[in-house]
Amino acid sequence: MSQAPLAVYLSSTNRMTNLPLQYVDLLRYESSVALLDQNGENTLWETVYYSASEQTEIYKSLTFIYALLKTDGDIDVLDHLSIARIDFCTFGNTQPFRIRVINRLNDNYDHFYVKRADASRAYGLELEYILSPNHVTFLVDGNTLIEEHVAGIPGDDFMKNKLQDTEFNQIRIAKEFIKFNERCFVRLLGDMRSYNYVVDITPDIEGSQIRLRTIDFEQQSCEGRKNFYLPQYFKDNNPIIFLGIQHMSPETVRQYQMEERSLIAMRAKSSRVRLNKLLHV
């Protein structure tokens, strides 16, 4: 990442580190096969394979990177971890690598991503950390960015399979979308089509709590059109928009908008030193 002021800021917030592997190193795979979902549909991801001479070192480096991301480099956890799979996304401009890490003690798995570092993505991740209720851990080294996995149902899958719910849950879905719409606009995060966020569902005493979480921060403050930063204007999101029209009055919509703006303002005040440093980069 060549933007020196941004690199200085990231270093001051402990985002910069020395990685044993770079994004370009993962591009040296020898073969790949399409990764299919449970229904046999193409996921637009490919599982990639490396030569035997390179695989051992790559897997070792990726395991260490996972320890840096999750345990601040505590190498004691490495004894129980191994790399199960490396996937490469062929869709869009980002083209990330998704790394699946297995805990051999219980066969539980987790993921993280290796991406090209750029200023827009770094700004977006930092603003997410400061202004949203969601924290995404990430690390940067030169032109490589490591990003933790955000768990949830992809927005487009959620639209297809999860909207036919109780009226109570449908109202909560519409409410969360209103708040998500505000969060994206206030911090100028664009292109929130349904495949660029996930839906985190938490069972509650009555019904479920819904949280929409961004997974693509590439389009941060990069466009002059207002509507680009409002998820409500992307037709992919129409099914949720229609839920809002069905269940919400204009007064209720304004109430939820004001609630979220107040929460964002509170987060900005509580992190004002860090936010001011970022905005002056």
What do the PLM-derived regions correspond to, one by one?
Residues 18, 22, 40-156:
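Conserved ATP-binding subdomain of kinase catalytic cores across diverse folds
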Residues 165-226:
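Conserved kinase catalytic-core segment
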Residues 204-281:
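C-terminal catalytic region of ATP-dependent kinase domains
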Residues 1-36:
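Long, charge-dense tracts
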Residues 23-42, 260, 265-272, 279:
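Phosphate/pyrophosphate-binding loops and the adjoining catalytic core of nucleotide-dependent enzymes
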Residues 157-164:
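AlphaC helix of the protein kinase catalytic domain
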Residues 131, 164, 228-232:
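Short secondary-structure boundary/capping segments
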